[in-house]
Amino acid sequence: MNATPATHDLAVKLALALVSVGLYWLVVVLTERYDWSGAVLGFQWPFHLRGLIFGALVMAPYAAGSAQRVVRMIALAIASALIYQLAVRFALDGPLDYSTIVIYVTAGAGAALLTGLAVALIAPRRFSWRLPVFTLVAGAIGGAAFDWQLPFAWAPNNLHAYLAWQLLVCLALDRGLRG
């Protein structure tokens, strides 16, 4: 069975999302082991690194063929770090009750929508009605996974949720940005 270019492209994107989740796991483990939780120059760098990794591996490839691609790729990684921070801050400090699934669904959907808009505007990519619909649905489902706690001894808390959210958002970006 021969893969079409679109199928191959999606497989590469999903593989990059898996690498992003693996690097998330590594950052969490190293942060806990070496107590890298302190701020450097006002930044909680392990915290921001998680968003940067997703942006660099999942969002930045959309800017690969554009003019000023390096600047756009860096901008997408930075946007991802900011989106990650906004989602976490909303979940922890927002107006909704932290103990319900609603906060996770809302934060996940909002972060996914912002991710799609960032790619469409910064990469840039042609905007379609499918992008906000797909990212909102993917983000909501991925966000709901954060309400489901799995006590794996070998994995940091919520690894399954990051895996679900990142893969679903990766798929939503791929399908939502197609013409």
Locate each region found by the language model:
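Juxtamembrane/disordered regions of integral membrane proteins
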Residues: 2-179
